[in-house]
């Protein structure tokens, strides 16, 4: 089994807080767009934005995997994208991850008001292969795709 490795950043290790959640039942396509939207934001800004998307006050822009996604009128012009969605399941996992990273930063003694998302990424996880029995002795495969997400918060 491979070892989990974070990217090498130019920020000192004592100014960083890390968190990872593995094998979550959320689409890696939705997680990719959520991560891209909040990358580089302050922690408070990211939470506020994600809560607005959960309440459907603002749509999450979809850069990739957006085929067939309709245009939304409540996307901010700063994104320069017209299509968006409300991926609630993915956002709940990302909010949980941000809470974990904030608690890690608090235990390290970092200033929570000055935390910025330095790195956030979503990766493909395991594929659980299952079979569903059908009539006349046949069976159909069912796949369940899992994902991983990681975040690094830095003190600015």
From Swiss-Prot:
Question: Gene3D superfamilies in the record, alphabetically?
Answer: Ribosomal protein L22/L17
What GO MF annotations does this protein's record show? Answer: rRNA binding; structural constituent of ribosome
RNA-binding found in the keyword field: yes
**One Pfam family matching this protein:** Ribosomal_L22
**PROSITE patterns the UniProt entry points to:** RIBOSOMAL_L22 (PS00464)
One Gene Ontology biological process: cytoplasmic translation
Q: Which GO terms describe its cellular component?
A: cytosolic large ribosomal subunit
Q: Keyword set for this entry?
A: Ribonucleoprotein, Ribosomal protein, RNA-binding, rRNA-binding
The Swiss-Prot or TrEMBL record describes its family as follows: Belongs to the universal ribosomal protein uL22 family.
Give the matching HAMAP family: Ribosomal_uL22_A
Matching NCBIfam families: PRK04223.1, uL22_arch_euk
According to its UniProt entry, the function of this protein is described as: This protein binds specifically to 23S rRNA. It makes multiple contacts with different domains of the 23S rRNA in the assembled 50S subunit and ribosome. The globular domain of the protein is located near the polypeptide exit tunnel on the outside of the subunit, while an extended beta-hairpin is found that lines the wall of the exit tunnel in the center of the 70S ribosome.
The entry describes its oligomerization and partners as: Part of the 50S ribosomal subunit.
Supply the name of the protein: Large ribosomal subunit protein uL22
Instruction: Please report the organism this UniProt entry assigns to the protein.
Output: Sulfolobus acidocaldarius (strain ATCC 33909 / DSM 639 / JCM 8929 / NBRC 15157 / NCIMB 11770)
